[in-house]
A protein has these predicted regions:
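N-terminal helix-loop segment corresponding to the beta1-alpha1 unit
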Residues: 1-184, 341
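Short Gly/Pro-enriched turn/cap motifs at secondary-structure boundaries
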Residues: 54, 218-226, 232, 249, ...
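Conserved Rossmann-fold dehydrogenase catalytic segment
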Residues: 123-124, 152-160, 183-199, 219-224, ...
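Flexible glycine/proline-enriched surface loops and loop-helix/loop-strand junctions
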Residues: 153-163, 238-245, 360-363
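Oxidoreductase and adenylate-handling cofactor-binding alpha/beta cores
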Residues: 168-188, 202-212, 261-272
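Aromatic-enriched alpha-helical interface/lid elements that frame and gate functional surfaces
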Residues: 230-313, 317
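Conserved PLP cofactor-binding pocket of PLP-dependent enzymes
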Residues: 311-334
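Flexible, small-/acidic-enriched active-site or ligand-binding loops
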Residues: 340-367
């Protein structure tokens, strides 16, 4: 499935957010030309992961070096912009304008261009426009780092560049939507994608609640979104090798908690007595006592044992794994097959696109 075949994308992005956006476009069939600075290129080429990480984010693209500080380089880039369908960058706002490649410059020679600017704070709001940003900086600025962890504790950032990734996904989504609209209107479009906007999308439900009530979200640690007393991470007994474990349980409703009680050997009717109805998600009449009793009971078996028993009973549950452990297990059961990507002479195994589409048994192909 290559729905973007024939789409020409000029890519002035680097690091994660922008390259991920154009990676998705390339994997969906677009012809992506990635412009890098001479003498080093994208900073990811020289980081600890080296060529493998760069390949994972840039497979399927044609990479060229252009010096945007030279008149010849700017002229070459402008000529490429004249013939592209989409131009995307994630430099600090103003960088391409200084090179004569801003939205108005490109629009003047290519009225139908979809011009996507990806930045920390957006390009349309003067007070914030010049600000630089990285993933962890945006997590701090938007309050994301104050959603994790426990009340009264230090800030806790998400352990991977979640904002960068979401920004890339949103940029690819926005560009695809703008391309579709252009087919109807024949007009180009300036698409402005900010990292703070992506952060609010990740915190969508919490953001809506703040707008509706003005209340600052509570820090919930490892508790589930539902607020159910049985939706949390709990310590379990050590496994056969003596390794301690944790079990994540998602018993959000009274009915699910009744099933949990059955697995524990408790009377399901007891759940009715200890829980309050009428809240949507389950609420305990005495939350502290409820959790203490449940936590104590879950220490009787290993996390693996609880996972199997609870899932069999219809209660969402999973033992705590690290990423490598999960990927090995997913491959072992045939649920996950790594996708091999190649860029130049480097081949790297990746998780693919995160989805499959198989009309008539034909899987999506990746470059």
């Amino acid at each position: 499935m290559q729905p973007l075949t024939g789409l020409k994308v000029l890519d002035f992005s680097h690091v994660i957010a922008g390259p991920l956006a154009t990676f998705y476009l390339a994997q969906l069939g677009a012809q992506v030309t990635k412009v890098e600075k001479p003498g080093g290129g994208d900073v990811l080429r020289g980081n600890a992961m080296g060529a493998a990480q760069f390949t994972a984010l840039n497979a399927g693209k044609d990479c060229i070096a252009i010096d945007l500080k030279s008149p010849e380089g700017r002229a070459q880039a402008l000529e490429l912009a004249r013939h592209c369908d989409v131009l995307l960058d994630n430099f600090r706002p103003g960088a391409l304008e200084r090179a004569g490649l801003g939205w108005q410059d490109v629009r003047a020679i290519n009225p139908k261009v979809i011009y996507c600017s990806v930045s920390g704070y957006g390009t349309l709001h003067a007070p914030w426009k010049p600000r630089g940003a990285y993933d962890h900086v945006i997590q701090a600025a938007t309050g994301m780092a104050m959603l994790g962890g426990e009340a009264g504790g230090p800030p806790l950032k998400v352990g991977f560049p979640v904002v960068d990734v979401m920004t890339g996904v949103l940029a690819a989504f926005a560009v695809t939507a703008a391309v579709q609209e252009r087919q109807r209107t024949g007009e180009g479009r300036l698409v402005d994608v900010s990292m703070w906007g992506a952060a609010l999308q990740l915190m969508y439900t919490q953001s809506v609640n703040v707008l509706a009530t003005g209340a600052v979200p509570e820090r919930v640690g490892n508790k589930g979104f539902s607020g159910s007393p049985a939706a949390e991470y709990f310590a379990a007994a050590p496994d056969a090798q003596g390794k301690p474990g944790h079990i994540a349980i998602g018993a959000n409703t009274v009915e699910q908690i009744a099933k949990l009680y059955g697995v524990l050997g408790w009377s399901p009717e007891q759940a009715e007595a200890e829980l309050e109805r009428g809240h949507g998600f389950a609420r305990a009449k005495n939350p502290v006592q409820f959790r203490e009793r449940l936590a104590l009971a879950l220490q009787a078996r290993s996390a693996q044992d609880w996972e199997e028993r609870l899932q069999a009973a219809g209660v969402p549950a999973a033992r705590l794994r690290d990423l490598g452990e999960f990927m090995q297990e997913a491959q072992a059961v045939g649920a996950f097959v790594p996708t091999l990507l190649q860029q130049g002479g480097v081949q790297v195994a990746t998780p693919g696109l995160g989805w499959t589409c198989q009309p008539a048994g034909q899987a999506v192909k990746v470059k």
